[in-house]
């Protein structure tokens, strides 16, 4: 099957994402294009094999992973102040520590987080303008 250049680039980028990042991407695509969540619209007895596998893989990944790391990928120059404030609000770092944490990216900012804590911290940092991944 041949794809155009843009599609090949997208597939290459997608292959580097972890399961949580893919899940976030799917949710954003659903919201952007107003696509209903197929998992919630499928009745348990009516699952097709591929749909059942996707659901089982998602549940399995959620069960296996209980501790997460928050990795700060990028901080746009114009968003530095907002990101520094968000870092100080999500960590115990002082201003110097927060500045040091954005000096050499990517950098692990937090570790041993529950999924809920990790998602909350990720949301705060992304709202401030940072690019963050959970691992």
From Swiss-Prot:
CC annotations in GO: plastid; ribonucleoprotein complex; ribosome
Subunit structure: Homodimer. Part of the ribosomal stalk of the 50S ribosomal subunit. Forms a multimeric L10(L12)X complex, where L10 forms an elongated spine to which 2 to 4 L12 dimers bind in a sequential fashion. Binds GTP-bound translation factors.
Gene3D superfamilies per the UniProt record, alphabetical: 3.30.1390.10
Record-linked Pfam families: Ribosomal_L12 (PF00542)
Keywords: Plastid, Ribonucleoprotein, Ribosomal protein
CDD domains: Ribosomal_L7_L12 (cd00387)
Alphabetized HAMAP family for the sequence: Ribosomal_bL12
Location(s) in or outside the cell: Plastid
InterPro entries: Ribosomal_bL12, Ribosomal_bL12_C, Ribosomal_bL12_C/ClpS-like, Ribosomal_bL12_oligo_N_sf
Coarse class of the protein's main subcellular location: plastid
Annotated SUPFAM superfamilies: ClpS-like, Ribosomal protein L7/12, oligomerisation (N-terminal) domain
Family designation: Belongs to the bacterial ribosomal protein bL12 family.
Protein name: Large ribosomal subunit protein bL12c
Signal peptide: none
Gene Ontology terms, MF aspect: mRNA binding; structural constituent of ribosome
Keyword Ribosomal protein: yes
Function: Forms part of the ribosomal stalk which helps the ribosome interact with GTP-bound translation factors. Is thus essential for accurate translation.
Gene Ontology biological process: translation
């Amino acid at each position: 099957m041949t794809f155009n250049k843009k599609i090949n680039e997208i597939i290459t980028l997608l292959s580097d994402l972890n399961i949580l990042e893919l899940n976030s991407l799917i949710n954003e695509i659903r919201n952007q294009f107003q696509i209903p969540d197929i998992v919630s619209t499928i009745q348990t007895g009516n699952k097709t094999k591929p749909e059942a596998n996707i659901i089982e893989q998602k549940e399995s990944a959620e069960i296996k992973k209980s501790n997460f790391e928050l990795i700060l990928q990028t901080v746009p120059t114009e968003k530095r102040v907002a990101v520094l404030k968000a870092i100080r609000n999500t960590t115990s770092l002082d201003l110097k520590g927060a500045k040091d944490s954005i000096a050499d990216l990517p950098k692990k900012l937090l570790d041993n987080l529950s999924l809920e804590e990790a998602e909350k911290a990720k949301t705060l940092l992304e709202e401030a303008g940072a690019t963050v991944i959970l691992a």
